[in-house]
Amino acid sequence: MKLYDTIVIGAGAAGLFYGALSEPGTDSLIIDHSERPGLKLLISGSGQCNITHDGSIKDFITRYGQNGRYIRSALYGANNLSLVEFLNKNGIKTVTRDDGKIFPESLKASEILNMLIKKSEANGFPLLIKEHITDISSDDSDGTYIVKTENSSFKTKKLVIAAGGMSYPKTGSDGSLYPLIEKLGIQMIPVRPALVPIYTHSYGYRNLSGISFKAVLVRLLENNREIAAQTGDILLTHRAFSGPAILDISRYADKGHKLEINYIYPVTGQRAADMIKADFQGNSRELHTYISRIFKIPDAFAVKLIENAGICPYMKTSCTEGDEITKIAEALTCHRYAVSGTGSFSEAMVTAGGVSLDAVNLRNMESKKHSNLFFIGEVLDIDGDTGGFNLQFAYSSAMAAVKNKK
């Protein structure tokens, strides 16, 4: 049986970064069970590939939830500037949007994917696709690993697992390698969908799908105690709340929590009430038109929001009572929705859970239990916010494994 220097399992972003970042001259292999490599990378950023985010790397730590502090060494060792420099050196110019998101100048994810494949192959990491892995074992006699597929067996000195999670299963990210990882005695954290819509009881905005709000404040509460807060854009879909602020906070959401939204942040409830009162006396406009105008919100949403407050949106503004003004102000700034659940893996952008960070030396991503066994990217228990943070970790963790500093 041929002995490879390195076998990478997974031809997603992390696996391809590993091949592309490695020194040339190796006799290695990247194996994937999908029909095409990098399918999830191709759809990232709606096909435009939001590859990373602008700003100081120290600010990235908070963008990975509670586990962010544990990957500090990986992020600092290969930061966002390093990633942009790597792309530039390989012929890909980048552009930074006003919101800090960084994209290839072409706005084509395929440009980055093609470069990573070409670079990996040039470095000695050809791709073997449509190979479903059935077993992974370690050979204690010589410290190597044997990877079995439905069609063949492969032996390698070093094994890098970059198999992703369970989000977007149609792209091949289906969690099928988890049982084989557990068989190696690696501690796993139960997985759950992350960066998903939040569903609520009596949602009520089905007919307003597509309406969005910028820079709102979103809070999650449990027994009236705040457990998470996020500012950013939100989107109303036909079934749930979505958009960056919702997706980022969804990792903390659970059935029974309350989702509180201030649609006109930073305006407070009291300030909103004062603004309504400022010109309502003698005002003959219909209430929904008045509210829509002064708070610059879509009229259709104003109608529904006022109805949700138990008030007729078509009454004359001048007929509004004081308690009704208070209810409208509260609906705008602190309305609470009962969370019924979050999106499934088919809706998730990433996977929370996976290989426990306690099972890995986070300086080089090597297993603490098995030498020369590495885990990189989404297969680890790391899920970042929207905005390029997950692809940044794919790069940073791959670089840490390539450098292999003990």
Indicate where each model-derived feature is located.
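Core beta-strand elements of the Rossmann-like FAD/NAD(P) dinucleotide-binding domain
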Residues: 2-4, 149-158, 229-231
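Short hydrophobic core segments
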Residues: 7-9, 31, 133, 154-170, ...
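Glycine-rich active-site loop/strand segments that organize a redox cofactor
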Residues: 48-96
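A glycine-rich dinucleotide-binding beta-alpha-beta segment and adjacent secondary-structure elements
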Residues: 129, 304-383
